[in-house]
Swiss-Prot record:
It is found in: Parasitophorous vacuole membrane; Cytoplasmic vesicle, Secretory vesicle, Microneme membrane. Glycans are attached at residues 257, 344, 550, 618, 755, 1022, 1050, 1111. This is Perforin-like protein 1. The gene is PLP1. Residues 463-817 form the MACPF domain. It comes from Toxoplasma gondii (strain ATCC 50861 / VEG). It is a multi-pass membrane protein. Keywords: Cytolysis, Cytoplasmic vesicle, Disulfide bond, Glycoprotein, Membrane, Transmembrane, Transmembrane beta strand, Transmembrane helix, Virulence. Residues 238-249 have a biased composition (Low complexity). Residues 154-329, 353-381, 716-736, 1094-1149 are annotated as: Disordered. Residues 162-177, 184-194 have a biased composition (Basic and acidic residues). InterPro entries: MACPF. Pore-forming protein that promotes parasite exit from host cells: mediates formation of a pore in the parasitophorous vacuolar membrane, leading to membrane permeabilization, thereby facilitating parasite egress from host cells. May also form a pore in the host plasma membrane. Preferentially binds inner leaflet lipids, such as phosphatidylethanolamine (PE) or phosphatidylserine (PS). Disruption phenotype: Strongly reduced virulence without affecting growth in culture. Parasites fail to exit normally, resulting in entrapment within host cells: defects are due to an inability to permeabilize the parasitophorous vacuole membrane and host plasma membrane during exit. Residues 201-211 have a biased composition (Acidic residues).
């Protein structure tokens, strides 16, 4: 049976054997019979007005005359008005449906009127969206939601393809209507409207990639609210029968699909884009300019059966010469196009039938063209000029440019997705379901890998070419990795060599490569592997002129340009063996001159290497050969060795030194230095060192002229009057005044200018700096990092020996400057500062002074454990000393003691030691560095907890020894020690004595306020205090902060009483301990035997003789002056026994000074 469904409504049910036809439809059913008859199914009249259903039976075999008869019958039915719309209740509407339709009519009426050429969507305020071709999906059950109830209809266990067609309409606030068609023998499952929204994707190709490709966001054709409405498709079953979609779907430009299927099968149809449909129409109508099958998006507009693979396509079936290709109604072996040119795909046992053109497939009047192949039906050319009576003629237009653009976009999207999809394996879930051979996959992967490698090679080729362009290095790179002698060096420059005399031969051997590691980041120059090079263009003049008052100021000025990593000083006696250092020492010793320094920098390059101990650098052949000759020990470090630094200074060829390995080490250090350069700024530097008379400086100050500004003006640095707060008259005097100064200019890098005062000459010099740069600022690292581990300790000992043997000693400075350096005097003239409070805290020196020595302690005698006890040394040369630790509880306390002076004593070195936790039973020992001995220090034993002070003890170190020890006390848990060391040849060292005392300790007595015990630390006889402190340790340290005091200088004793604080309860008392430590100086030590002492002694003696009638009782601050009275004959000197006792309490001691001989010098 062949059924043609001319549905004018979106709602109807299946038709099977001419039975049960739903409302509002005209159906022509043709049976295989011997005669043609038109008879109503439900009405007696042959042509009643607006009949519902008719059947047209005849014999099965189609032919051309049967086609003509069928077409004439259909045309006649249309002329008699049988294709009119019928309302839901079966009544015939008025003749003029267009006039009877109101804006409030149902969507079905609006769709009906639009289909037969009535008012358009704009007039009816409704929008019509054409059908789209759909795909078939296997489902097991359908859930249908009506306006009244929800019904579930389970299907058979086997998957039944079901086709759902939707029409979309949009109206204000309306819901979506969907109608599902099912088998004819089932009852209606849907009577109302389903309140659901279509979720069909608009993209024509998304369903091909649903296995792993995410869906695109839905893009509606209409703006505003959209609704979907379903139009049913008729089904028929039986051998050799074929199905056709309704003619009304043709009017709506919807592709109809008819399939040979079992009667339990259903299909689900999703809408497709209007642009896609118009593209197919244009192609079927044969409009010029349409693309071929291979380029049109219609080529991919096909349904995919999810349960089977496609076996043949239309082109293959036509090429085989299938006899059914031109059959109008199809045959038992395949599907053919219907009379209106629709191509239908059918599925039977996993086989896809071929599709052919139908009646209107090639005619210009065909409303749609859904076939993938151009129809070969001869009726297409015969009826080319016949108008389609069932469609709106205005909607049949050729493909627009916009539709063609949409088609190309769809084709482009498909081509973009196809390669991605083809990369997937041929798994059963894959969309194409093709078994790809493994060899093909391997070949494809191999080709893809070859393309990737080729692309990488093409990308890397320009980079390698860029790297090969870098062929030069920066001019000053040869200084990087060079050795440096910190004792003989001088970054400012040497007057004789006009350069830094500390630069030594290269130590590091660099490797270069033209790659990303061997070329600078700007791809201009080569750089060492593991290092870096970059341009650094900067020329600046110092904003301020530095006034150098002493050797410490000079050393600090040099350390700005040459320092260890982080800016710390290089080491002992740094730069002291250079000519510039000796000259400045002579100049600064003169009290009638003032020295100033001004620097100008012009930097061009910066270079550096990685400063890591884990990086093994390559060294030069000469350095490696020198290291191989070094022994593993340094003989002079042995106390029994007779070759000391003093012996080497006096006679290095003496037998005491030649029999040792000391010459080998000294030769190695003199050749390669003590350090090596790891970072440098290369360019030029011009240093002005100006010396002016003291009287000249005082005269300028009296005139109101700023000395530093005047020097800048004379040196060409700044304009007159800059930075001065004087009157205009004084400014005029400043501009007219010329200082009488002695100027020395040192130039490093570039071509030295002829006249350093000429700006043009200075500009020419700055231009030559880039071609001839030299290190103007650099950082160094100790050379022992490049030595084997077994030789590093010996190298450190050798460097200390070298610094003392070659550099200036205190005796040398005394002889050079004519000023006696005496350690007790220097310490006595310093300022003591004691601070207490919560940790960390800090103690600060008075203005203009820096730290000479000191310590910071963290104490807690209430909490158990030993982690609450810490001690560190205060770094010299800084303005303050920071505490140690943090306050984790209210009983954590800090104590800081520092000694401040105008300049640090570089020869003093501090040592701190702590015992491991719970090691109180072991003796703690600390040693001074090489060639140094103890000046003073103390050791303390402590224990945590409220009763820890019961085990507290303190001991002093012995002056002149190289080791200081602290023996534990009973019950102690931790020992810590602090001491200071100095060169054993330092003047006045033998005058000092250390004293430590533990006073009252035990339970605190709150009734004895400020008198709870005492501590009294006394100096030995004939000595006075140089420095020291007294302190009270308490269970609650926060309540005794005021009981931490420094001892008065020149006094004979230092004492303090307890505060009397007890916060214990019942029989639990707080503990406390009072203790102190002092350094005393003796008064019977002869003065230093130097020539200047003789002159001062005679002068002082004459001066004293002139003071007749004066009280001969000397104040404590006159003790040292009295020591130098009459060096030629014995003198009586009064020394107070206790400075606090007043002038009436004094003890006299006579001492006889040894005669001074010039031969002793």
């Amino acid at each position: 049976m062949f059924v043609v469904d001319l549905s004018l409504s979106g709602n109807m049910r299946s038709l099977t054997h001419g039975k049960s036809i739903h409302r509002s439809s005209i159906v022509v059913v043709t049976h295989c019979s011997h005669r043609l008859s038109l008879s109503p199914l439900n009405r007696p009249a042959l042509f009643p007005s607006h009949s519902d259903r008719y059947t047209v039976p005849w014999r099965c075999r189609p032919s051309s005359w049967r086609l003509w008869i069928t077409f004439v019958c259909l045309l006649t039915l249309h002329m008699f008005g049988l294709s009119s719309a019928v309302k839901r209740d079966g009544e015939v509407p008025t003749a003029n449906l267009r006039a009877s339709l109101s804006p409030d009519s149902s969507k079905e009426d609006a769709m009906l009127l639009s289909a037969i050429g009535g008012i358009g969507p704009t007039e009816s305020r409704l929008q019509h969206i054409p059908f789209r071709t759909t795909r078939y999906l296997p489902i097991r059950s359908h859930v249908l939601q009506s306006t009244v109830e929800r019904i579930e209809s389970p299907e058979a266990l086997n998957e039944v393809p079901t086709k759902v067609e939707r029409n979309e309409f949009t109206e204000k606030g309306d819901k979506t209507e969907q109608v599902l068609t099912a088998q004819a023998d089932h009852k209606s499952l849907l009577e109302g409207r389903s309140e659901s929204t279509s979720t069909a994707p608009d993209d024509d190709f998304d369903f091909l990639f649903e296995d792993d490709t995410p869906k695109k966001p839905k893009s509606r054709v209409n703006k505003g609210t959209s609704s979907d409405e379903t139009s049913p498709g008729d089904r028929s079953s039986g051998e050799g029968s074929s199905a056709s979609d309704s003619l009304l779907s043709v009017v709506h430009r919807t592709k109809g699909n008819a399939t040979q299927a079992n009667k339990n099968q259903k299909r689900i149809t999703h809408p497709k884009s209007k642009a896609q449909h118009q593209k197919k129409v244009t192609k079927k109508q044969g409009i010029p300019g349409s693309d071929s099958l291979g380029t049109s998006s219609a080529d991919f507009d096909f349904d995919i059966d999810s349960s089977s693979n496609t076996q043949a396509d239309d082109s293959q079936r036509q090429s085989l010469g299938d006899s059914s290709a031109l059959d109008l109604f199809g045959s038992d072996t395949g599907d053919t196009g219907d009379i209106f040119g629709f191509s239908n795909s059918s599925s039977d046992g996993g086989n896809a039938a071929a599709n052919d053109g139908g009646l209107f497939s090639s005619s210009g009047m065909g409303p749609t063209g859904a076939s993938d192949e151009t129809s070969a039906n001869p009726l297409g050319s015969i009826l080319g000029g016949v108008l389609n009576p069932f469609a709106q003629q205005q909607s049949i237009t050729p493909m627009t440019d916009k539709a063609d653009e949409w088609s190309k976009e769809n084709m482009k999207a498909f081509e973009e997705k196809m390669p991605k999809k083809m990369r997937d394996d041929g798994s059963p879930d894959s969309w194409y379901k093709q078994a790809v051979p493994q060899e093909s996959v391997a070949d494809l992967n191999r080709m893809r890998e070859n393309r990737r490698i080729a692309e990488e090679n093409r990308a890397a080729a320009p980079l390698s070419a860029v790297y090969t362009k870098a062929t030069k290095t920066v001019p000053a790179i040869n200084y990087l990795g060079a050795g440096y002698d910190h004792v003989r060096g001088n970054p400012v420059g040497d007057p004789s060599s006009m350069g830094d005399p500390g630069i030594r031969p290269p130590v590091l051997r660099f490797t270069y490569a033209q790659n990303e590691d061997g070329v600078s980041n700007d791809l201009t120059v080569l750089q060492p592997l593991g290092g870096y090079v970059r341009q650094y263009v900067a020329c600046r003049q110092s904003e301020t002129i530095s006034e150098l008052s002493n050797l410490s100021d000079y050393q600090n000025e040099l350390s700005v340009d040459a320092s260890l990593q982080g800016g710390d000083p290089i080491g002992l006696n740094s730069f002291s063996a250079s000519t510039g250092y000796r000259d400045f020492a002579k100049e600064v010793s003169k009290k009638d001159t003032r020295t100033y320094m001004l620097k100008n920098y012009c930097m061009r390059y910066e270079a550096g290497v990685a400063q890591s101990n884990h990086l093994k650098w390559n060294v030069t052949l000469a350095f490696a050969a020198g290291v191989s000759q070094l022994p593993d020990v340094f003989d002079a470090h042995n106390p029994e060795c007779a070759c000391s630094a003093e012996q080497w200074r006096q006679d290095q060829n003496a037998e005491a030194c030649t029999k040792t390995n000391v010459p080998i080490w000294i030769s190695f250090i003199e050749q390669f230095g003590t350090h090596f350069l790891v970072r440098l700024f290369a360019g030029g530097k011009m240093t002005y060192q100006v010396t002016a008379k003291r009287s000249e400086v005082e005269k300028m100050r009296n005139m109101g002229i700023d000395v530093k500004t005047q020097l800048k003006m004379q040196l060409g640095g700044v304009s007159g009057g800059a930075g001065q707060g004087t009157s205009s008259k004084k400014n005029q005097s400043s501009s007219e005044y010329q200082m009488n100064v002695q100027k020395e200019t040192l130039v490093i890098g570039g071509r030295p200018p002829g006249n350093v005062s000429d700006p043009a000459a200075l500009a020419a010099w700055a231009d030559t700096v880039e071609e001839l740069p030299m290190p103007v600022k650099f950082e160094v690292q100790p050379l022992y990092h490049l030595l084997p581990v077994e030789k590093q300790e010996a190298f450190k000992q050798a460097v200390t020996f070298y610094s003392k043997a070659v550099g200036l000693t205190p005796q040398d400075l005394s002889a050079l400057t004519g000023v006696t350096r005496n350690l007790p005097k220097q310490l006595t003239q310093a300022t003591q500062v004691a601070w207490s409070g919560p940790p960390p805290g800090f103690a600060k020196c008075p203005a203009g002074q820096v730290v000479i020595l000191g310590f910071a302690m963290h104490l807690n005698f209430k909490e158990p454990g030993t982690d609450n006890f810490r001690i560190i040394s205060c770094p010299p040369g800084r303005e303050k000393c920071d505490g140690v630790g943090t306050a984790s509880s209210e009983t954590d306390e800090g104590r800081i003691y520092i000694l401040c002076g105008e300049e640090p004593i570089n020869e003093i070195q501090q040592v701190v030691a702590e015992s491991p936790a719970h090691a109180g039973a072991s003796v703690l020992e600390a040693s001074c560095p090489d060639e140094t001995v103890v000046v003073g220090g103390f050791g303390i034993s402590v224990r945590g907890g409220s009763d820890g002070l019961d085990s507290f003890s303190i001991e002093s170190c012995t002056t002149g020894q190289t080791i200081c020890t602290k023996a534990p006390t009973r019950g102690s848990e931790k020992n810590f020690l602090w001491m200071m060391c100095v060169d054993k040849q330092y003047p006045g060292l033998r005058e000092l004595v250390n004293v430590a005392e533990l006073g009252s300790h035990g339970n605190a007595n709150k009734r004895a306020v400020n008198s709870d015990g005492n501590v009294d630390v006394k100096c030995p006889a004939n000595s006075s205090i140089v420095l020291g402190y007294v302190m009270e340790a308490h269970t609650n340290m926060q309540f005794v902060r005021d009981k931490f005091l420094q001892c008065p200088e020149n006094a004979s004793e230092c004492k303090m009483t307890g505060k009397g604080v007890d916060h214990g309860m019942l029989w639990l008392f707080d503990r406390h301990a009072l203790f102190g430590w002092i350094i005393c100086k003796t008064v019977n030590e002869p003065a230093m035997h130097v020539a200047t002492d003789v002159g001062k002694a005679k002068g002082n003696g004459k001066k004293k003789k002139g003071k007749k009638g004066k009280n001969k009782t000397n104040a404590p601050n006159e003790v040292e002056e009295g020591q130098q009275l009459g060096a030629d004959s014995p003198s009586q000197v009064s020394v107070p026994a206790d400075a606090d006792s007043g002038p009436t309490s004094k003890t006299m001691s006579s001492l006889k000074l040894a005669p001074v001989k010039l031969l002793d010098l």
